[in-house]
Amino acid sequence: MGQKVHPIGMRVGVIRDWDAKWYAEKEYADYLHEDLAIRQLIQTKLADASVSLIETERAINKVIVTLHTAKPGMVIGKSGANVDALRAELNKLTGKQVHINIVEIKKPDLDAHLVGEGIAKQLEARIAFRRAQKQAIQRAMRAGAKGIKTQVSGRLNGADIARAEGYSEGTVPLHTLRADIDYAWEEADTTYGKLGVKVWIYRGEVLPTKKSVKGEK
């Protein structure tokens, strides 16, 4: 059977950038484990803050963490109380100085992670899986998506045999490297077990910018 490559991994270095922007030699393993611990802490503390992407950069004894969120007010808190508490915990965890930057996601309906999270929460609230998917697709298309595909798999409606069911609208060209495709998968904990949610969103083509050559007039 044909398998699908991860759409984001395939585009890293072409139209996507790395989530961790640092280089290390002997300390690589330590930095990697530290990054994983940072991500785990943030995802636990800000589970309801619609955080889609966590980027890390490093300097000497300093870590810069950039959070992409649809709810910046919830991350910052009253007078910055929440972000200060998070910074203090990250400082303690890493033993380094941690700087936190917050970037607002203007269109959460075009973010695969947030769309998948929304579908998963609806499934946990016992909303029909077909309805949850179709509503998410309608919202994404209204927000300006060129195409979207969703899939829910597991014991749908408590069926004895697990299956996968998905819907799509528009085009989702997975083979086109210049196509800006956002992909994410989430899990929903239901009374019948876990359901997997996958979302692919095609946001249009990223055209390569012409690089100026020295001496070119």
Swiss-Prot record:
InterPro entries attached to this UniProt entry: KH_dom (IPR004087), KH_dom-like_a/b (IPR015946), KH_dom_type_2 (IPR004044), KH_sf_prok-type (IPR009019), Ribosomal_S3_C_sf (IPR036419), Ribosomal_uS3_bac-typ (IPR005704), Ribosomal_uS3_C (IPR001351), Ribosomal_uS3_CS (IPR018280)
PANTHER family from the xrefs?
Answer: 30S/40S RIBOSOMAL PROTEIN S3 (PTHR11760), SMALL RIBOSOMAL SUBUNIT PROTEIN US3C (PTHR11760:SF19)
Q: Which family does it belong to?
A: Belongs to the universal ribosomal protein uS3 family.
A molecular-function term among this protein's GO annotations? structural constituent of ribosome
Species this chain originates from: Lactococcus lactis subsp. cremoris (strain MG1363)
GO terms of biological process kind: translation
Q: Which GO terms describe its cellular component?
A: cytosolic small ribosomal subunit
Its subunit composition reads: Part of the 30S ribosomal subunit. Forms a tight complex with proteins S10 and S14.
- Keyword Plastid recorded: no
Which HAMAP family does the record associate with it? Answer: Ribosomal_uS3_B
Which keywords annotate this record?
A: Ribonucleoprotein, Ribosomal protein, RNA-binding, rRNA-binding
Q: Name one Pfam family in it.
A: KH_2
Which PROSITE patterns did the record assign? KH_TYPE_2, RIBOSOMAL_S3
- The protein's name in its UniProt record: Small ribosomal subunit protein uS3
* Location of the KH type-2 domain: 38-106
Family matches, as NCBIfam families: rpsC_bact (TIGR01009)
